Amino acid sequence: MKRIILASGSPRRRELLSQIGLEFTVITSEADEHTSIKEPARYVEYLSSVKAEAVHDMLQNVLTDKDNDIKLSGEWYNDIMAGSYVIIGADTIVSHKGHILTKPKDTGNAFDILKELAGDCHQVYTGVTLIKNNNVVSNFAEKTDVYCNDISDNEIREYISTGEPMDKAGAYGIQGRFAAFIGKIDGDYNNVVGLPVARVYQELKLWLN
């Protein structure tokens, strides 16, 4: 069995992978996440690949003694040397009428984002990249349509005051208090949380053994 490496510090992605019974290790990087790509699906596909490839490069540097930030046990070292691992990179964004919405810069930006989403349908895209044996073996984007109910300005301010929106794409967490404002979704709920685990699992089955 190959080792699974999650190239993300997101607690929500960790919870989702644990929820389906997978054992994995988290390794994060300081990948450059700037891109001029405007199309939502391509945007997340690209950034998920950047994150996965950055962690892959870190592991290769460990093997050549160029990076001492990651300490590997002997068993881990042998598995990495043998290419016996799969890296999962992921990136999630919200898109409204083609406008990409990432994490809010401040509370004012969070208010503007939530005001834009209120009473309308938007899309959540999560891009996923799998790397095995130095090769990208899977790179895809999953889309979910999310319909928000009307939200008053006071409700938006109260929600922002909880601090919940500030580290989330689109300034909300569907698994948190914002669930009160969701009318319906079309697609994978877990994709909105941060990772389409059902599809990820199916992809992993192709490459883990």
Predicted feature residues:
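Short, acidic/turn-prone active-site loops that include or flank metal/cofactor-
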Residues: 28-34
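Short, glycine/serine-rich, charged loops/turns that create anion-binding
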Residues: 11, 31, 135
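N-terminal beta1-alpha1 ligand-phosphate binding loop
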Residues: 2-22, 28
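Anionic-ligand binding patches
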Residues: 2-3, 26, 41-209
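Short Asp/Glu-rich motifs
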Residues: 35-36, 178
